Amino acid sequence: MNGDSRAAVVTSPPPTTAPHKERYFDRVDENNPEYLRERNMAPDLRQDFNMMEQKKRVSMILQSPAFCEELESMIQEQFKKGKNPTGLLALQQIADFMTTNVPNVYPAAPQGGMAALNMSLGMVTPVNDLRGSDSIAYDKGEKLLRCKLAAFYRLADLFGWSQLIYNHITTRVNSEQEHFLIVPFGLLYSEVTASSLVKINLQGDIVDRGSTNLGVNQAGFTLHSAIYAARPDVKCVVHIHTPAGAAVSAMKCGLLPISPEALSLGEVAYHDYHGILVDEEEKVLIQKNLGPKSKVLILRNHGLVSVGESVEEAFYYIHNLVVACEIQVRTLASAGGPDNLVLLNPEKYKAKSRSPGSPVGEGTGSPPKWQIGEQEFEALMRMLDNLGYRTGYPYRYPALREKSKKYSDVEVPASVTGYSFASDGDSGTCSPLRHSFQKQQREKTRWLNSGRGDEASEEGQNGSSPKSKTKWTKEDGHRTSTSAVPNLFVPLNTNPKEVQEMRNKIREQNLQDIKTAGPQSQVLCGVVMDRSLVQGELVTASKAIIEKEYQPHVIVSTTGPNPFTTLTDRELEEYRREVERKQKGSEENLDEAREQKEKSPPDQPAVPHPPPSTPIKLEEDLVPEPTTGDDSDAATFKPTLPDLSPDEPSEALGFPMLEKEEEAHRPPSPTEAPTEASPEPAPDPAPVAEEAAPSAVEEGAAADPGSDGSPGKSPSKKKKKFRTPSFLKKSKKKSDS
């Protein structure tokens, strides 16, 4: 080792600076006024602007001419109908037209066919496209059949049963007119809709072309027409070509009973197929090979055929036939030959054949009795609807059970509203109007499709035809309906006998109509209340206006009430003395008037006195001026006048003196005229004038009560001042009348 060598210094290159990573703020110019405006904007306002940007799609749809034309056609059709609920059907059609979005996550669907490609591209053509004039042209039964058959074509495409445009599925529309529905020749299974199906007759002539310009494959319909002509019970015929089915049709052993699906098919028929049916003899041979009972027909070296009394039953048999063929092909490939297979005994498995059963568990009612294939077909229709196909299938039984209410509506108050406010981008919600309409439609459809409780079940004897015997069975179980809990509002820990007794008492009160205002308050029960007005005897002129139930003490009287009932004995005694003093003063005045009359000349004619309504003139003409010696009497008489008031009449009307005065006050009747003309002296004018004078003085005093000391009146008038009681005036009026 060299001593001059020194420790080498290892130098490394300076670390290279990491490349600058562009950040968000590097792309933003902080001095940009647009950026400053957005930064200073309120969060709610910024969110509103973002929502407006998202809703531009709606404005684009509304401005498109195609949407306007479709909307106008819908509205015109609704105006022509006029019997549907206001706007409900039109709103539903508009919603169906606009909500064509497909969910991002699809349920698991069968692989194969063009439908898988369409779903991957996000394009799905609706099955039920009957709108406007198309929906009016068909009745309800034909609409449902069109939707079912079009959905069947979509299922065949999803399962991979289609072979371009050559397979056919047909259904019988009308037994009387022998009309059938078939797909237009040249249309793929993924393109079939309800309106595109063609209606033909038994000879293959087109009755209704549908919504396409395509024709019908006459040669392909020949097989279907032969089956329909031989089997009136058949409503649907399916003819498909699958690789597994073609392989089994080429085997000499045919379909082996090695799987439950093969045993569920029943008796399998075979026919040596020699190409397109053009001869009538070939049709007769097919009808003979199929027979009156078989549901499955295998065409040698060609394909598979299944028939059914409904679309659901035909689908059930063709599905099991395809599955059985696939099982057999794979089993033979692994086993090496049919000799190495274990075959099932059909006699043992016939009673245990796979048939759809009723669901077990708690439900709102008795479950429907499913026909063959209905339950499976309905489940697949639910899958298509979830994928966005809009099949229009009438479901017989809802998949989700509606929970029964545990409590009464009055116990649990409403806490939320039934309205949903969803944005346009949210496809998982719908408007409450559409939701309620769909719920009503589902309830109506479920009620229409529900079978009777004692429905007839058709079963054969010893494997014979199902039509040979009809057996009526009772409904399984009792119909249960959700009802309110008994004794819901009865308090806990109470004796049920007491509750029943109280209930019986309430019922008796309702029957006897014994209803009161309820219990009285005990707050003021010990307080004594002084009543100023005491109800006494009620005096009336008629008993008709008084209800005896509330006023038992009624006195009928033609005169007024007694005014002295409220006075004491002392007050009555003072009043009697005062009346006597007034009577003595009136007698003295009468004596003075007679003396003056005697002193007057006898040949002076008598002045006719006016009627009692003008007593003032009589007082001025006839009453002489009194002497000054009577001032003492006037002074003693004057203080007693204010005590007399018209509100306190006296009951002492029965004095004989007052009765004589009343007779003197009466006007002369016509019958007394001859007596007045007699030569006997008539001292009538003087007493009448003297009696009229006090009344005139009374009226003057009533008009001017403060004029006692006025200089215009003489002392004689003050002395003659006499106030007649009010009860005396009333008696005068009654006597005059």
Curated annotation (Swiss-Prot):
InterPro entries in the record: Aldolase-II_Adducin_sf (IPR051017), Aldolase_II/adducin_N (IPR001303), Aldolase_II/adducin_N_sf (IPR036409)
Name of the protein described by the UniProt record: Alpha-adducin
Lineage per the UniProt record: Eukaryota, Metazoa, Chordata, Craniata, Vertebrata
Subcellular location as annotated: Cytoplasm, Cytoskeleton; Cell membrane
Biased composition (Basic residues): 715-737
Residue numbers spanned by region Disordered: 1-21, 421-486, 576-737
Topology within the bilayer: Peripheral membrane protein
Chain positions covered by the region annotation Interaction with calmodulin: 717-734
CDD domains in UniProt: Aldolase_II (cd00398)
Domain text: Each subunit is comprised of three regions: a NH2-terminal protease-resistant globular head region, a short connecting subdomain, and a protease-sensitive tail region.
Sequence similarity: Belongs to the aldolase class II family. Adducin subfamily.
Sites bearing Phosphothreonine, chain numbering: T331, T429, T445, T480, T614
KW Transcription (keyword) present: no
Tissue/organ expression: Expressed in all tissues. Found in much higher levels in reticulocytes than the beta subunit.
Entry keyword annotation includes Acetylation: yes
